[in-house]
Amino acid sequence: MSEDINNNLNNSDNSNGSNEKIIVGLDEAGRGPVLGPMVIASVKIDEKNLYKLNDLELKDSKQLSKKKREELYIIINEMCDVEKIVIDPETIDKQMEIINLNKIELSAFSKLSNHFIRENDNISIYIDACSSSEQSFSNQFKAKLINKNVEIIAEHKADENYKIVSAASIIAKVTRDRVIEEYKETFGEIGSGYPSDPKTKKFLKNYVYENRTLPKIARKSWATSKNLLKEIEESKIFQWVK
């Protein structure tokens, strides 16, 4: 599952005819859930228009109500250039066979960033660092960029400290939430998709015990999924012994 970014990358004009300073914010939603996609979002705005974002009640998406996130999602899309990469569970599982989640995230972050750098390399990129070391994350991120001279501000809690990253956080969160709502139309109540959510745990356990397999919306590489499948196998052995 993916959104418009691939077409936009292929069809984008490599020059926007301007070298005015631009600001880009990057963040993700859905890194830890056992159900559903991980969404990587970027938000770009001309530096001269950054004050417009500062006038909004932007903060980390988790600190906002669903209604407020939806309202801001519309405003941000109207005000900024927004791009998203939606990585579905199957793709996450395949990539996790060869790389870890941090590298999956880094790859998506760099893909979005290079899209903007091709248009204008006079750019500052603000990004929520997804590893324990901000410097290590920044170095790995920069290594994937087509221009190593762009300014990178990679920090923990950047979604709380910089409005441009808060905006990306909101875009990512709302996009993922909408996918989860689509899932509910097919599967019924599934909760938030996080392993700690009682509704998610109940749905997943019931589904696995009824179908003897995981739903396609589950990340099979997650410990929660593996443990459930192990329970099924052990229950089969127990019934055979009886």
From Swiss-Prot:
Record localization: Cytoplasm
Entry GO MF terms: manganese ion binding; RNA binding; RNA-DNA hybrid ribonuclease activity
CDD domains cross-referenced by the UniProt entry: RNase_HII_archaea_like
GO CC aspect terms: cytoplasm; ribonuclease H2 complex
Documented EC number(s): 3.1.26.4
Free-text comment on the cofactor: Manganese or magnesium. Binds 1 divalent metal ion per monomer in the absence of substrate. May bind a second metal ion after substrate binding.
PROSITE patterns recorded: RNASE_H_2
InterPro entries xref list: RNase_H2_suA, RNase_HII/HIII, RNase_HII/HIII_dom, RNase_HII_arc, RNase_HII_hlx-loop-hlx_cap_dom, RNaseH-like_sf, RNaseH_sf
Enzyme type, top EC level: hydrolase
Gene Ontology terms: biological process: DNA replication, removal of RNA primer; mismatch repair
Residue ranges of domain RNase H type-2 in the record: 21-234
Cofactor(s) recorded in Swiss-Prot or TrEMBL: Mn(2+); Mg(2+)
SUPFAM superfamilies: Ribonuclease H-like
Binding annotation for a divalent metal cation: D27, E28, D128
Catalytic activity: Endonucleolytic cleavage to 5'-phosphomonoester
UniProt keyword list: Cytoplasm, Endonuclease, Hydrolase, Manganese, Metal-binding, Nuclease
Protein family according to the UniProt entry: Belongs to the RNase HII family.
Role of this protein: Endonuclease that specifically degrades the RNA of RNA-DNA hybrids.
HAMAP family for this protein: RNase_HII_A (MF_00052_A)
UniProt-recorded name of the protein: Ribonuclease HII
Originating gene: rnhB
